[in-house]
Amino acid sequence: MNVDHKGHTITIKDTQGDFSSFLDKVSQSNASFESHNLIIDLSHNKSVTNTDLKLLLPLSKQHKKAKKSFVVVAEGIDFNAVPAQLVVVPSVLEAHDIIEMEEIERDLGF
């Protein structure tokens, strides 16, 4: 697990390719991340499925409740089958763009 902190955003990258252990690590250390916008980068793990992504919903809901963004980066999945409550994009650049847009929406009171 690689953690990169830039400004108001933390990017957590799965470096081992084992989604279950990665999810456990992120869940255990979520308390230290919940005051920041979070990007979960699973782009290097080609075995991630939509079922795996659904396991991230509780973390996403916690961040949304705290008025912070939670974006998942994943490739090779069916984006139409992803739950609407979860923001999933194909690249880290798009994840940063989503966070910037959500920050603007929050600043405007939406």
Which role fits each region the language model picked out?
Residues 23, 27-53:
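Short, glycine-/small-residue-enriched flexible loop/hinge segments at domain edges that mediate gating
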Residues 1-27, 44:
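STAS-typified acidic loop motif
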Residues 60-82:
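Short aromatic-glycine-(Arg/Gly/Cys) micro-motifs in beta-strand/loop hairpins
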Residues 96-110:
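A charged, well-structured terminal subsegment
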Residues 87-93:
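Short acidic-hydrophobic, aromatic-tinged amphipathic segments that line or gate anion-handling sites
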Residues 4-6, 31-34, 63-65:
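Flexible, charged surface loops at secondary-structure boundaries
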Residues 54-58:
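Alpha-helical scaffolding segments of alpha/beta enzyme cores, especially the outer helices
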Residues 8-9, 35-40, 67-71:
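Hydrophobic beta-strand segments of well-ordered beta-sheets in folded domains
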